[in-house]
Amino acid sequence: MLRTISILGLVFIGIYSCRKNNQTNIPYVPVNESLVLAEPSNFPLTSVGGWVYLQSGYRGIIVYRKAFNGDSEDFIAFDRACPRHFDQDCGRLNVETNDLYLACTCDGKRWLLINGFPEQDDAGFLQQYQTTFGSGILLIRNF
């Protein structure tokens, strides 16, 4: 019995020690955006690979359309705050001209726009927001 408990404890520790820490230090700011895709300012989101900047969030939000299935999985939204420099003036992420990466203007660290994964392990994780899509309206929230 004691051996079984010890083995289960080791398995539990092993599973949870391998998890990546996806938490960010970016301060919490309530986000509750509603985008109508038919509006001209949101036209880039009507096609795969399109993106728009929003003024909400901590340093702004980038919304990217990664698929065209007609559901919430089509979109991804991140705060534009750099995880490493969010409290500095240069700590705002911008989409690079190739439309593939977000880059920090402080140190040039990059994240894939399609999923927010860092190009380098030490870059940190982006603050992602929940997206819900239906009837031509995209909701972006963090609550």
Q: What function would you assign to each model-found segment?
A:
Residues 1-18:
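Sec-dependent bacterial lipoprotein signal peptides
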Residues 4-7, 39-40, 106:
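Generic hydrophobic-segment detector
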Residues 20-98, 112, 127-143:
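N-terminal pre-ligand scaffold of iron-sulfur
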Residues 96-106, 118-131:
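Short cysteine/histidine-rich metal-coordination sites, predominantly Zn2+-binding motifs
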